[in-house]
């Protein structure tokens, strides 16, 4: 079931001229890119409710009470903005059935870890508010959340600003019997994935990362994986709207130099 509130394209209509100009520049950069290129599909099925918010789309897992994945396009103009971080976590009104609340995370030993981060949402007040919905949150190790994961979020904004736009999908990697927290039994991921697609020097490039849900500080290159490797681990097919020949090329390998790593 797809729940639509305000699509990203609609939200952009309310933005400044600079936002519109940047969006036009992005469309000129790659006019043949299919719409919603970031939306993945499952290779192996799992419970989900598909929800579309202002700035991102998510697949919510009603058994785990966390997202299966969160996907969005980040554009150059969206890396700028003055909407301040809210730090007010809310129940997602579009989740059917049980949605966790902020108290599930209290004294759990885990951060309320964003998938679509607040730092990517400063361009629009609705986007900022909705990224604090608990459907966009996973239990995340504090040191990971504030450390290497945050470093990658900042890299993503750098890439969007440099290349015009970047397509992003992220989410949890789960065990068969995960630890749970809170009265709503929110599942704790074993690890997290994040994959990126961008047109760099007129060629599509993709790269992925896997982080174990624990403390540690390493060079980002040590987390790198091919998209094919992450698909095998997660059971999710990323960027399926790419032409097959392009998809097969960019997903079998990655080039850290192309991404400036």
Identify what each model region corresponds to.
Residues 1-261:
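Domain-level detector for secreted/extracellular nuclease and nuclease-toxin modules, and
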């Amino acid at each position: 079931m797809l729940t639509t509130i305000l699509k990203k394209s609609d939200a952009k209509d309310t933005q400044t001229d600079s936002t519109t100009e940047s969006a036009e520049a992005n469309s000129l950069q790659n006019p043949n890119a299919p719409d919603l290129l970031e939306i993945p599909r499952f290779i192996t099925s799992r419970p989900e409710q598909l929800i579309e918010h202002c700035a991102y789309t998510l697949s919510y897992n009603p058994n785990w009470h966390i997202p299966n994945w969160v996907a969005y396009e980040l554009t150059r103009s969206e890396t700028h903005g003055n909407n301040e971080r809210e730090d007010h976590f809310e129940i997602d009104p579009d989740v059917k059935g049980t949605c966790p609340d902020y108290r599930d995370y209290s004294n759990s030993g885990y951060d309320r870890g964003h998938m679509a981060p607040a730092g990517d949402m400063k361009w629009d007040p609705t986007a900022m508010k909705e990224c604090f919905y608990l459907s966009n949150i996973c239990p995340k190790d504090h040191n990971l959340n504030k450390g290497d994961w945050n470093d990658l979020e900042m890299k993503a904004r750098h890439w969007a600003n440099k290349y015009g736009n970047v397509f992003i999908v992220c989410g949890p990697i789960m065990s068969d019997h995960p630890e749970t927290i809170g009265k709503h039994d929110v599942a704790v991921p074993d690890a997290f994935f994040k994959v990126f697609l961008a047109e760099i020097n007129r060629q599509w490039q993709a790269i992925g990362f896997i982080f174990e849900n624990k403390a540690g500080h390493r060079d980002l290159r040590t987390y790198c994986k091919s998209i094919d490797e992450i698909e095998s681990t997660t059971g999710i097919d990323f960027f399926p709207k790419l032409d097959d020949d392009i998809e097969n090329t960019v997903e079998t390998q990655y080039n850290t130099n192309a991404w400036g790593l």
